Amino acid sequence: MNRGLLERLFDLRGRGTNVRTELIAGVTTFVTMAYILFVNVRFLGEDGAGMPDEAVFFATAVAAGVVSLAMGLFVNVPVALAPGMGLNAYFMSVVLGSGGTITWQIALGAVFVSGLLFVLLTVTRVRQTMVAAVPPSLRAGITVGIGLFIATIGLKMSGLMTISVPPGHAVDPAKGGVLAGDAFLPALGDFIHRRDAQLALVTLAVIAVLMALRVRGALLIGIAVGTLVGVPMGVTDFSALGSAGWLPDFDRLAVGALDVKGALAVGLIDIILLFTFVELFDSFGTLVGTLNRAGLLKDRKQGERTVGRAMLVDAAGVSAGALLGTSTVTAYIESASGIAAGGRTGLTAVTTGVLFLAALWLAPLALVVPSAVTAPALIAVGVL
């Protein structure tokens, strides 16, 4: 594809940018987002919601790649998308907390329906009324609550914190896994004897230092360093790479495995609505914040049209992601890193999308990265 075609397709000159800057911005965005390839496997995979690890990695990479490409080509904005943090954690809790009544296939069906509802709200412009009706304090509360939820899961997965059920308080599957009596006992993990907890501390320290130094891709670099440090500690096992191919096992994919009928039959209306409303507010806030930083909302009417089209792609991406086999796909605030690097057009998002598709070759690495390494990334994201 020649530069002239890219110029016409993305209006590079009109937005004061060039091909080189957009490509660098796309790579920057990918580096800051790529941690989701490994973290999502821990949430939805065999150690989380019970899906095949290869299926989750495939769905994460393809959904992020395809929907980011759509955002870049159809809306021409430098915003990339991928399965969102927070809603993937909620997805896991819905499956694990149901006592076996809600399978991951049914949960995917709920995500698919929420995406269709999101599309309907966007097309009918009801979303504008809904967003305006929610007070800023409630929006902030939702964000903080999701962050604490993610951080708590990260602390538990890493072994830095344990949660025990006190005597007389049993888990009640009929109440979605909520402890009867609404009680649980958090405590510090065993740092002395548990190597995974020690590795999690080291990884968290590396991520914290890199973030303090404003290093782009701090989470991805931290995951890589933690994985290598885990080898002499006996936590990371690279032996699986010897028998693994450099592409996912296509016989274990979850494409089209969602159960929409089951989701509606079980009566997951409250869960579907929660998915929808969190998607709506999260998407709107991220898009307005990133596009404003890119200088694409200066003209009010044009800005409203741009945000509306971007939210439509985001909404369609939710259902597309569920069809592929992953939790809610949403716009990523990490897109701001690419914008800071000069990204102003959809070419940035297209570049990021292509890199996510190319990342399918990294599938075996997702299987060897231990949860003690991905968990600190959850803690960092939750705190932020």
Where are these regions (language model features)?
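Inter-helical loop and helix-membrane interface segments of multi-pass membrane transporters/permeases
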Residues: 45-53, 93-107, 128-139, 148-208, ...
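Helix-loop-helix junctions within the multi-pass membrane cores of secondary transporters/permeases
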Residues: 2-36, 40, 84-93, 97-143, ...
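Membrane-helix interface "capping/anchor" motifs
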Residues: 69-83, 209-220, 340-346
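Active-site cofactor/substrate anionic-group-binding motifs, chiefly glycine-
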Residues: 48-98
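Hydrophobic core segments of alpha-helical transmembrane domains in multi-pass membrane transport
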Residues: 25-41, 60-72, 92-93, 112-122, ...
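Structural signature of hydrophobic alpha-helical transmembrane segments
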Residues: 49-62, 102-116, 164-168, 187-199, ...
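Helix-loop-helix hairpins and the membrane-proximal interhelical loops
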Residues: 1-57, 186-189, 221-308
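Helix-loop interface residues and adjacent transmembrane-helix termini in multi-pass membrane transporters
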Residues: 50, 76, 101, 123, ...
